[in-house]
């Protein structure tokens, strides 16, 4: 079933953390959720050129804290912080409470699945061959330390009359392993022939301690070979057979 479920949703609380962190009673839950969706939609539309990876929303004590993970923090902040102040006012208006906006830089965008998917989408819109775009992104991710990456594109590839899907993979992408730290991203490319969907899975290792989610993880060591089983302890030696 690893191929039929959202890779992030099935790992919440195991290897992934929530993008919205707040508690609401039954009467407020729907309005809070709708406000989160509107804020994310507005920010992604206004920051389309800023390389936004994800948007975290927290609601501590009748205020709101929005953290934007982006590959281009300068585009978000603007000249002397003018742009981010405008965003803060719009977010406060949408959420109905005072809002604070924090900006976090994504230092390795080649290892962020959402940014990789958006990069491939932009290349397809510039009429670059889809296979070249896929292989370039896969090569960059593996070069920067990913343990595995898979890219899937679907639609009227190269303007073909019949839509199809093609994928390319390097390394391991264990979708059935719940403790696997798999980053998932999706983007759409609007071409003259129609919409092309891009899905990206990036495997970064395994998570053994949920409290360390979001921090840098060490590469998982390979399993021992069957011959390397270590000492099995003292065993009584068998008596040698007498020659007949």
Curated annotation (Swiss-Prot):
A GO cellular-component term linked to this record: cytosolic small ribosomal subunit
Biological-process GO terms, alphabetical: translation
Family named by the database record: Belongs to the universal ribosomal protein uS3 family.
Cell membrane is among the record's keywords: no
Domain KH type-2: 39-107
Region (Disordered): 213-244
Subunit text: Part of the 30S ribosomal subunit. Forms a tight complex with proteins S10 and S14.
Recorded superkingdom: Bacteria
Gene field: rpsC
Gene3D superfamilies in alphabetical order: 3.30.300.20, Ribosomal protein S3, C-terminal domain
Protein name: Small ribosomal subunit protein uS3
Function: Binds the lower part of the 30S subunit head. Binds mRNA in the 70S ribosome, positioning it for translation.
Composition skew (Basic and acidic residues), residue ranges: 216-244
